[in-house]
């Protein structure tokens, strides 16, 4: 008989700790978007440095 109140208390404590699937999906989408943005910024930086170097070699850039 004592197990029932303990079980109910454990259920009440565990239910708010369960992750919300929508919240987890939003967090993973935000992380993925941030990684894609960082990757695009890196590619833009690499391309701009290559173009700048080529421009200096050819004499197009000041």
Swiss-Prot record:
One of its GO terms (molecular function) is toxin activity. Its main location: secreted. One of its GO terms (cellular component) is extracellular region. InterPro entries: T-conotoxin. It is found in: Secreted. Keywords: Neurotoxin, Secreted, Signal, Toxin. Belongs to the conotoxin T superfamily. The mature peptide does not contain cysteine residue. This is Conotoxin TsMLCL-02. It comes from Conus tessulatus.
